[in-house]
């Protein structure tokens, strides 16, 4: 039983799949970093407000400078995430294009083999022969319909009538002579009935 599970077919992972996975992992890490920076910016803004309220203007100003720098990092992170996502889309689309190209390649090979069996010259020859056959039959039809005279038509009708009559004629009587003896049953049937004598 263990061998059955050990021999389970493994899915094929290509280099493109690995690249896409790595890019998505980097994108996710950048998004986590963005989330962390955003929360930190919110805390620093609240802290700067508190420092101003306490009269510590210089410290608040220094904190806002740090906040501004982090905002610039956040903007760069957005650009990096966009680049990663675009790269993922490009790779995935390239994989689709490769499959399409492979399909076209197989189709072209199939067409080449078909063309080797049936060349253009062969197709033209068959079409010419077909057209010649149609033209020949048309000429025969024209000859049959146009060259017959009225006498020919009458002779054809007479022959057709004669053939029809032959099919309708009754079969001839048998040529063998009839038997001389009457069958026994027929003789009994024809035997005269006895006459009854009247009482005196």
Curated annotation (Swiss-Prot):
Record's bilayer topology term: Lipid-anchor
* Covalent lipidation (N-myristoyl glycine), chain numbering: 2
Motif Type-2 MIT-interacting motif positions after renumbering to this chain: 168-179
Principal localisation: membrane
Give a GO biological-process term. vesicle budding from membrane
Which locations, inside or outside the cell, does it occupy? Endomembrane system; Late endosome membrane
Coiled coil (residue ranges)? 9-102
Domain of life per record? Eukaryota
What GO cellular component term, any one, is given?
A: ESCRT III complex
Question: Keyword annotations for this protein?
Answer: Coiled coil, Endosome, Lipoprotein, Membrane, Myristate, Protein transport, Transport
- Asked whether the keyword Protein biosynthesis is assigned, the reply is no
Q: Where is this region: Disordered?
A: 166-200
- Keyword Cytoplasm in annotation: no
Q: What does this protein do?
A: Probable core component of the endosomal sorting required for transport complex III (ESCRT-III) which is involved in multivesicular bodies (MVBs) formation and sorting of endosomal cargo proteins into MVBs. MVBs contain intraluminal vesicles (ILVs) that are generated by invagination and scission from the limiting membrane of the endosome and mostly are delivered to lysosomes enabling degradation of membrane proteins, such as stimulated growth factor receptors, lysosomal enzymes and lipids.
- What family is this? Belongs to the SNF7 family.
The UniProt subunit note reads as follows:
Probable core component of the endosomal sorting required for transport complex III (ESCRT-III). ESCRT-III components are thought to multimerize to form a flat lattice on the perimeter membrane of the endosome.
Protein name from the UniProt record: Charged multivesicular body protein 6-A
> What is the species of this protein?
Xenopus laevis
